[in-house]
Amino acid sequence: WFDENHPRYRAAACRALDRIFASWQESRGAARAGSAPIFEINTGAISRGWRTTPYPAPWILQEIRARGGQIMINSDSHAVDTLTCAFPDAVKLALDCGFTRVKIITEQGFEDYSLI
C-alpha cells in the first residue's frame, strides 16, 4: 500500500497529468480546440469491498480540473446489481472538487451531463 498524499507521489501524479495534457494538445491540435481529456471517477473497488470511497483522491481531481480536464463516472462493473454502485458518492466527490458536469456515453458519442 502507498500514501497517495506523500509528496513524491503527488509530484509524480502531477508530472503524469502534465504529460497527459501536453500529449492531448499535441495530438488534437486545432482540430479539437476547446476539448480536453476525460478522466474517470471510479467506484469499482467499493462494490468489491476494497475501498470505501471513489477514486482518484480529491486532490488529483482538483489537479485535473485546474488543468481543464473533464470527468465521467464509472463503476467498472461486470454485473447489473453493481452497475451504479456508490454513484451518489462519486457525484458528491465531483461536486466537492468543483466539477458541475460529467461526460456520458450515448449513441452519438460523449455528451455533457449536468450534475446540478
Pin down the residues of each PLM region:
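A short acidic, helix-capping loop that chelates divalent metal ions and anchors anionic groups
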Residues: 1
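Charged catalytic cores and adjacent phosphate/nucleic-acid-binding surfaces used
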Residues: 4-116
